């Protein structure tokens, strides 16, 4: 999938993790995924991210490191075309702007999210919008402080329970297929 050189273990480890954690995004059925990734060498990690990005960008998928500590990173894998539509949706933008997002460009929104991840004591709840979660569910999650959901899967569901359960099943099946094919 990524066209890596044989024997490049660290890059292969990152790519396997991307397939494992982000299959629905890779397949184009989900806007984005987010996962934690541990690394040994920051220089090697930066090189791995650069190479993976080069390989995925031509497929319409991009990688951003949202937060990095000594040996761990929070990696955001996304489809810019889908994120563009999301941030230009007025319901999504109303929530984002209430949290201090001031520009609708993809990079400006990602940069604001990075800043909020570094400065907020809690994980920013609007991140669900960056992952393609339904706006109504994100609003209710924030309002209910994560409580009182109808069901829980990829996200906590407050509306359209049956549709969400079907979506979760599609994501799970996609992940299973991608892991069989690519790992």
Functional labels for PLM-detected ranges:
Residues 48-105:
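A glycine-rich, hydrophobic loop/mini-helix early in the fold
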Residues 154-183:
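Long, compositionally biased
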Residues 2-6, 97, 113, 161, ...:
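Intrinsic low-complexity, intrinsically disordered or marginally ordered coil/linker segments
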Residues 22-28, 63-67, 114-119:
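Short, flexible, solvent-exposed loop/turn segments with mixed acidic/basic and small polar residues
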Residues 39-47:
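Short, surface-exposed ligand-recognition loops at beta-strand->loop->(often short) alpha-helix junctions
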């Amino acid at each position: 999938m990524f066209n890596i050189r044989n024997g490049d273990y660290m890059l292969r480890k990152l790519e396997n993790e991307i397939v494992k954690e982000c299959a629905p995004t890779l397949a184009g059925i989900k806007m984005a995924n987010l996962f934690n990734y541990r690394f040994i060498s920051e220089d090697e990690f930066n090189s791995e991210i650069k190479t993976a990005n080069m390989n995925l960008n031509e497929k319409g998928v991009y990688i951003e490191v949202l937060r990095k500590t000594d040996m761990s990173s929070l990696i955001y894998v996304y489809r810019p075309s889908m994120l563009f539509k999301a941030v230009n949706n007025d319901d999504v933008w109303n929530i984002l702007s209430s949290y201090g997002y001031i520009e609708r460009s993809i990079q400006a929104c990602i940069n604001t999210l990075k800043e909020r991840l570094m400065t907020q004591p809690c994980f920013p709840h609007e991140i669900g919008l960056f992952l393609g979660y339904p706006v109504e569910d994100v609003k209710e999650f924030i309002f209910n402080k994560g409580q009182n959901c109808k069901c829980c899967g990829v996200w906590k569901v407050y509306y359209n329970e049956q549709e969400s359960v079907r979506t979760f099943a599609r994501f799970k099946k996609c992940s299973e297929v991608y892991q069989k094919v690519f790992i």
